[in-house]
Amino acid sequence: MHIPSCETAELELIRFAPALEEANRPSPDYDTERWLYVPNVYSEYRYILGTRGKHPLICIGINPSTAAPDHLDNTLKSVERIALYNGFDSFLMFNVYAQRATNPDDMELTYNAQLHQENLQAFDYILSLDQNSAPAIWAAWGTIIEKRPYLPPCVQDLIQLGKARHAVWYSAGKRSKKGHPHHPLYLRKDSVLEPFDASSYIAQLIQK
């Protein structure tokens, strides 16, 4: 379980670009040819965790917990199973907000603009990785998006980046009454990805 030790504004953030350089170098802790883990050390935030491939499924949750290479939590195990079932050769777990907190109630109340900007750079990078087609994005944040008022605008920024890369959005499982995409944890391993109109969804959410 991860409980934030401080506000992320109190940290000296590792910027995405140098963190990616480190993540692409050999590590004694895990196989860097299999895993993409940015930053490549456990910290109070995480930009990316996933497997390397030519046709990845990008899954977007709200915020990271404790998972690391070779130590996936149940949510990421589900993400990997569903990605493979739907014909992808790899998965990349990304989050609306990069702060680690196992309990979303522990997420910071004050949005850190610098952390978000670094996270956007990470997102644009993973959007560029699909070698076969337009990037595929699985919206999977569940109702947790209601936990903090800064989260929907963060999603809106991700949608804009996705448009520039001609990304295709999906969800899996039944959506909530308010239209939130289902969280991966309790989905069947044979869950099929369905088209998701992310732009209409976020426009309605921000209007409320």
Predicted regions and their residues:
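Active-site and ligand/interface coordination hotspots across diverse enzymes
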Residues: 1-73
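Glycine/proline-rich loop-helix segments at beta-alpha junctions forming the active-site rim
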Residues: 2-3, 107-208
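Short acidic (Asp/Glu) patches
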Residues: 43, 72-80, 113-122
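Residues at the starts of beta-strands that form the adenosine-phosphate
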Residues: 56, 89-90, 136, 168
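A short mixed-secondary-structure module that forms the rim of ligand-binding clefts
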Residues: 65-87
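Feature marks short, surface-exposed loop/turn motifs that line or immediately flank catalytic pockets
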Residues: 66, 100, 145
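Short connector loops at secondary-structure junctions
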Residues: 89-107
